[in-house]
């Protein structure tokens, strides 16, 4: 419900802006580095395996100039993020290497302040909120632990984060489970955009989720984005 409210607020804000506001529409693309912040409890833990994983994003930007310096910044982007985690179920590492790959549609709403450094360069720091909707990016790989008495083996498997995963982990009646990831996410975003010669842009943003995208292990999105673009 909170995520849907953010979407409604973004759309409403875009509709009620003064007609005199100058609108700049652009396109941008780039790469991101992502991982998950962890706050699991009750035996459900998670750890990042390796460093932050690279992904990509493509999108459309819409900047509304309000007055001399203030700007309302929004748009819509398609972002794919990746991570590899060690996932624990009741303190047992049933999933020592779990690939997580997701596609997301990101809708931000930021307030920016345009600092005109020169006739050819502007810097725009910004802060705001975002809402996103996740959809599948195909099968992901994971390693699963099988235990029969003192014999422990690791076997490869496939899973889809939006569907979750479960399997029989050994005797007697043990099972390993990964809860499905949620589609809707929302959180905060801060950024800096450089506008060169009024048309070319270089942007850096950091997004952090407020909502747990996977409640079982307490995972929240954390993504650094770098983009270059063109404003019409």
Language model regions located:
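Outer-membrane beta-barrel strand-turn architecture
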Residues: 64-68, 115-119, 196-198, 232
């Amino acid at each position: 419900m909170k995520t849907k409210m953010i979407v409604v607020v973004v759309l409403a804000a875009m509709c009620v802006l003064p007609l005199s506001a100058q609108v700049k529409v652009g396109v941008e693309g780039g790469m991101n580095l992502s991982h998950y912040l962890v706050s699991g409890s009750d035996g459900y833990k998670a750890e990042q395996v390796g460093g932050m994983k690279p992904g990509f994003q493509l999108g459309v930007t819409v900047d509304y100039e309000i007055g001399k310096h203030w700007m309302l910044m929004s748009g819509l982007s398609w972002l794919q993020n990746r991570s590899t985690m060690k996932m624990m179920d009741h303190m047992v590492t049933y999933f020592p290497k779990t690939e997580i790959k997701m596609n997301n549609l990101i809708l931000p709403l930021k307030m920016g302040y345009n600092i005109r450094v020169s006739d050819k360069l502007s810097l725009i720091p910004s802060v705001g909120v975002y809402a996103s909707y996740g959809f599948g990016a195909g099968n992901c790989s994971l390693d699963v632990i099988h235990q029969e008495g003192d014999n422990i083996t690791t076997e490869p498997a496939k899973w889809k984060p939006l569907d979750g995963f479960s399997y029989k982990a050994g005797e007697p009646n043990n099972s390993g489970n990964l809860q499905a990831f949620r589609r809707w996410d929302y959180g905060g975003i801060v950024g800096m955009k450089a506008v060169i010669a009024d048309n070319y842009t270089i942007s850096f943003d950091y997004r952090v989720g407020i909502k747990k995208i996977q409640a079982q292990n307490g995972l929240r999105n954390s993504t650094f984005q770098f983009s270059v673009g063109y404003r019409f």
